[in-house]
Amino acid sequence: MAVPKRKMSRSNTRARRSQWKAEAPTLVKTIENGKVVYSMPHRARVIEDAAGTPLYMEYKGRKVADV
């Protein structure tokens, strides 16, 4: 395992770490019940009744799991 020869300064450490950036998630615009909804692609979504109780999960128009 490599061992640094000298201690890295706080400013150099923070400058190196500042390059680690989170990527924004890709969102897909869909229309559900007349409303525009943004969701992540290739994910199952939870179908709820009018009261907001989760019923099941759906993917590509098919029921894939019970909640």
Swiss-Prot record:
Residues 1-19 have a biased composition (Basic residues). InterPro entries: Ribosomal_bL32, Ribosomal_zn-bd. Pfam families: Ribosomal_L32p. Belongs to the bacterial ribosomal protein bL32 family. This is Large ribosomal subunit protein bL32. GO terms for biological process: translation. Keywords: Ribonucleoprotein, Ribosomal protein. Signal peptide: none annotated. GO terms for molecular function: structural constituent of ribosome. The keyword Lyase does not apply. Residues 1-21 are annotated as: Disordered. One of its GO terms (cellular component) is large ribosomal subunit. NCBIfam families: rpmF_bact.
